[in-house]
A protein has these predicted regions:
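Conserved alpha/beta enzyme-core scaffold
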Residues: 1-321
Length: 321
């Protein structure tokens, strides 16, 4: 089997300016944050992001000036903020191009891309302002081959004239970047807990990069093939990055870090304090190891360690510190 192992810096360096991307995870769960920070250190620009429910992975990239356009349903860190602060600021200032969908319709778009079909029918947008409003103009869409020609299309069912559905365009990206609990060097992956839309996003991407808490033997994972929903041949690169989702949670490994998330959201409200945050935790550290030391090292990481019985930390103070 091919050895697909690569270091984090080398993996992030594969992504050029202007790439189309999706990131795995959901709000405060299992985002590939170490990879995101490495892209910021590399100075990436003009990225096109597609997602259903991203969190601070998108927010910090947007704040760092790395993103040109997003197509999404929601971007926030649940209990810490209803809308990502840098995302909100970028929209209010007209600094980012964006298009709005529902959660289900974005997952349907990834599913269409994974299946190799041009669109997917859904009902979830009917009767909503999401369907009625389109922020990307037809001229912008026509001029950019990375953007669908239309946001959506309502059609009458060819099987029942009383029935209507919405067609949403497929999403295919240059890169999908996921963080998982376990991976093998050949690209075999193990998700523990919810997969969210990671499987669809991976199969809808030309290149799949995975960061993992643990690297294990492929034969170990193959003993339970039903728990490996992405085929090894769909994965291009694997990085060993313990605590690679911090400050977000990885089920069975660690909870999200409320101290760090609180610090981020307080800093991200203001341009100057956000710049200081980036300097302290991203641009001012050499690599992921230095980042973990900067946020508090072993003492902080032990604080968020998951209980073997629960898969998360039941003792963690989650909101008001």
């Amino acid at each position: 089997m091919t050895d697909k192992m690569i270091d984090l810096h080398g993996a992030a360096a594969l992504v050029p300016d202007g790439a189309t991307m999706s990131f795995g995870g959901f709000t405060t769960q299992r985002h590939p944050m170490a990879f995101v920070y490495e892209m910021i250190r590399l100075g990436r620009r003009d990225l096109y992001l597609f997602g259903h429910s991203p969190g601070g992975d998108w927010d910090i990239l947007i704040g760092a000036g790395a993103v040109k356009r997003v197509e999404l349903a929601y971007e926030a860190d649940e209990a810490f903020n209803t809308v990502g602060p840098r995302w909100r600021r970028a929209v209010e200032r007209g600094q980012i191009e964006w298009e709005d969908y529902s959660n289900f319709s974005m997952v349907a778009r990834f599913t269409a891309g994974a299946m190799g079909i041009p669109f997917m029918p859904v009902r979830s947008l009917l009767g909503s302002d999401v369907l009625a409003k389109e922020t990307l103009l037809p001229g912008e869409r026509k001029a950019d081959p990375r953007t669908a020609a239309r946001k959506s299309h309502v059609m009458t069912s060819p099987f029942d004239p009383r029935d209507r559905v919405v067609l949403v365009p497929a999403v295919r990206t240059d890169f999908a970047v996921l963080h998982v609990q376990k991976a093998a060097a050949d690209g075999t992956l193990r998700f523990e807990g919810q997969t969210f839309a990671d499987v669809q996003q991976a199969l809808a991407a030309d290149t799949v990069i995975v960061t993992a808490e643990e690297i294990v033997e492929a034969d170990t994972l193959r003993r339970e093939p039903e728990r490996n929903p992405i085929p090894f041949f769909a994965v291009n690169h694997v990085c060993h990055v313990p605590f690679g989702a911090h400050p977000y949670a990885v089920y069975n490994y660690y909870d999200y870090d409320p101290v760090q998330l609180k610090e981020y959201h307080e800093a991200a409200r203001d341009d100057a304090s956000f710049a200081r945050y980036l300097d302290k935790y991203v641009r001012g550290v050499r690599d992921h190891g230095q980042y973990l030391e900067a946020v508090g090292g072993r003492a902080r990481l032990d604080m968020i360690k998951a209980s073997p019985a629960c898969g998360y930390s039941p003792e963690l103070k989650r909101r008001r510190l």
